């Protein structure tokens, strides 16, 4: 969403509002004022910055379309710990893109590597997704270190339940920092509107979060989902077909379990209207979105002192939580071949089963043809050749392959969609961010 026309844009802050919001927008580093001092330095294989397209001319032919689709794609070859490689790509609809992402390796949790892949689907601005990219993985690492340390003297690995609890606590702490600690700091330092802008913007906007963690030591995979991004595992079945194994559930008002949870937490109150929180917000779980979490007293004080927009009437907040649902699985690379993670921009146009089929066909063509013939058994040759090809494979990056098909597949269809620029583009497509992780037993 364009910063200066969004709900957290030029009309948010009172008293020379444009000046101070402009400062916050151009210098988001001001948020470092409140970065925790115990932040952990992590190994990031590739830089993870928000992507701003340099291609302002709409593509009109196949080469132009491919160039636009490949602008931010990346392939990282790992070749160890059961991971062959991972592919990433992103195509924006908003300007700037509200999605963000992170890929991290940490070596300080236990005796092996821990891998993290995150996708953060922002809404009402990019500030919350940016904050999550900077802070969520370090927070999770801190909690996992505490968890594994408690098992060290037992010479044992933590249970899945223990790991899940640690990840959930990290999610909750980060959201508490965004929503409550920051506003307390603002109230205690009322003279600094610059700091107020930098601290409150991540609370005013919002973001879903999909974070996958993988332990090289135990081969345990945890997928933590807050919101409606999605993760699905591609499993090779004994008969040579592919099966889509869901590792997350979309958390919206259309999810019956989420609707029931909200009814229990807010008895007698109509929380869902048209399947949206208070008739406004689609995801039922998210970071930020503080208007649905602050008390009426806090919202009204912020309105008096900082905001020009009126607060949402609330009775029993919070209506939205950042506590994730977590699915855990022990990876068996013989059958668990790949994991697809994507923001809802992809899932708006295809099912989990379609995505797994597309990646399976892509792997058949691209990974199959790169097999080393001299060091490969017949079973290995066939391992990526399980499908009759039904879709044209143009890309050597699986994430790009998925995005191409989500936009229609044909050059004519993709060109029409990419010709539309923000804000008109938002009527037809969302930001799309995709990561595909490939597992391989030969890298163990």
Curated annotation (Swiss-Prot):
Binding note for cofactor: Binds 2 magnesium or manganese ions per subunit.
Domain of life according to the entry: Eukaryota
GO biological process, one term: generation of precursor metabolites and energy
Residues where Mn(2+) 1 binds: 121-122
Family matches, as PROSITE patterns: PPM_2
Principal subcellular localization: mitochondrion
EC number of this enzyme: 3.1.3.16
Keywords recorded for this protein, A-Z: Hydrolase, Magnesium, Manganese, Metal-binding, Mitochondrion, Protein phosphatase
Reaction equation(s) it catalyzes: O-phospho-L-seryl-[protein] + H2O = L-seryl-[protein] + phosphate; O-phospho-L-threonyl-[protein] + H2O = L-threonyl-[protein] + phosphate
Domain PPM-type phosphatase: 85-439
Disulfide bonds: none
Pfam families: PP2C
Subcellular location: Mitochondrion
Protein's UniProt keywords contain Mitochondrion: yes
GO-annotated cellular components: mitochondrion
Cofactor(s) it depends on: Mg(2+); Mn(2+)
GO molecular function: [pyruvate dehydrogenase (acetyl-transferring)]-phosphatase activity; metal ion binding
InterPro entries in the cross-refs: PP2C, PPM-type-like_dom_sf, PPM-type_phosphatase-like_dom
Enzyme class name: hydrolase
Name of the molecule in the record: Protein phosphatase 2C homolog C10F6.17c
Organism placement in taxonomy: Eukaryota, Fungi, Dikarya, Ascomycota, Taphrinomycotina
